[in-house]
């Protein structure tokens, strides 16, 4: 049975074909969606609402550009002082880790076999 990230292709509740969703904020590429069945929709009339909870939209590191031709991502630049203060996490090469594990395993096997 073919599956796409845990959702079967034959199940009518899932859309596995990508599509574009146009909104006021921009265009979104939807890779997977779930079809809603028998879910109640409540329309909100602004004149009749008594209390609305306002939630500020989080700022994206990539601002939405006005032109749709070539969207570019502008990451926030940090000053050299901020870069020096931030600790850098160093990663060990996975090849070095596997060699270390293999050497330790070999040494342990030799000790046990003696």
Curated annotation (Swiss-Prot):
Keywords: DNA-binding, Host-virus interaction, Inhibition of host innate immune response by virus, Late protein, Phosphoprotein, Viral immunoevasion, Virion. Residues 76-86 have a biased composition (Low complexity). The modification Phosphoserine is found at residues 60, 69. One of its GO terms (biological process) is symbiont-mediated suppression of host innate immune response. Signal peptide: none annotated. One of its GO terms (cellular component) is virion component. The keyword Nucleotide-binding does not apply. The keyword Plastid does not apply. GO terms for molecular function: DNA binding. Phosphorylated on two serines. Disulfide bonds: none annotated. InterPro entries: Phosphoprotein_F17. It holds the Pfam family Pox_F17. It is found in: Virion. It comes from the Viruses. Residues 58-86 are annotated as: Disordered. Its main location: virion. Self-associates to form high molecular-weight forms. Interacts with protein OPG157. Interacts with host RICTOR and RPTOR; these interactions disrupt the mTORC1 and mTORC2 crosstalk. Belongs to the orthopoxvirus OPG062 family. Plays an essential role in virion assembly and morphogenesis. Also plays a role in the inhibition of host immune response by dysregulating mTOR. Sequesters host RICTOR and RPTOR, thereby disrupting mTORC1 and mTORC2 crosstalk. In turn, blocks the host antiviral response in part through mTOR-dependent degradation of cGAS, the primary poxvirus sensor. This is Phosphoprotein OPG062. It comes from Fowlpox virus (strain NVSL).
């Amino acid at each position: 049975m073919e599956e796409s990230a845990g959702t079967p292709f034959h199940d009518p509740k899932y859309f596995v074909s990508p599509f574009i969703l146009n909104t006021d904020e921009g265009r979104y590429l939807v890779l997977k969606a779930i079809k809603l069945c028998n879910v109640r929709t409540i329309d909100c009339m602004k004149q009749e609402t008594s209390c609305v909870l306002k939630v500020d939209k989080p700022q994206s590191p990539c601002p939405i550009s006005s032109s749709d031709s070539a969207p570019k991502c502008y990451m926030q630049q940090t000053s050299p002082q901020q870069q020096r203060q931030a600790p850098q996490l160093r990663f060990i090469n996975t090849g070095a880790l596997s060699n270390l594990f293999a050497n330790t395993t070999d040494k342990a096997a030799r000790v046990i076999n003696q």
